[in-house]
Amino acid sequence: QDSENQGTYTSAVLGSGVPILIKIGEEYIESAELLSFITDKKIYEYPDVVFSTTIKNLGNTHISPIGEISITNIFGQEIDRIKFNESSQSLLRENSGIYEDEWYNKALLSEENKVMFGPMKANLVSTYRTISPGFAPLTAETTFWIIPWKIILGTATAIVLLILILRKKKK
């Protein structure tokens, strides 16, 4: 044995498993309430928005809310649509869960040349029923602003400098 490492022992035990949710019994109640649908900030420089949705499971079985978040601009044009709870994360009975979904775009114009700055509106439409057929929507709306202030400041500075230069040349 190496005398330098004598008495030193490291062990790592790794384990993994897949959680399995089983429904037992006959009387399932699927009921949920949408407690909040908000963004992490009210003003953004670029479309890098995190939507946070809190849902409370009021039923006696687990649910997996899924849906879509549609984003519209100042002109009411839908500029993007993202999945809500794309991973289908379940919510156990009598618990609340917070779901975070991100909308990210580097541009200020959509692929269809729709404006992606100014006041924006996001609409969430989610469903959660799996056992009995039917439509049980959870809907909410939130607003936020996208203000590219660096671009605005740079443009305004350039305009002011241009005006000052033109005035000096006229004199």
Predicted segments with their positions:
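A short beta-strand micro-motif common to beta-rich folds, especially ectodomain repeats
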Residues: 1-4
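C-terminal edge beta-strand
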Residues: 8-11, 17-22, 140-144
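A general structural signal for short secondary-structure junctions and capping/turn motifs
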Residues: 11-12, 134
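Functionally constrained cores in energy, signaling, and assembly domains
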Residues: 16, 30, 101, 167-169
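Membrane-proximal extracellular "stem/stalk" segments
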Residues: 25-154
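Alpha-helical membrane-embedded segments
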Residues: 155-161
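C-terminal membrane-anchoring or membrane-association module
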Residues: 161-171
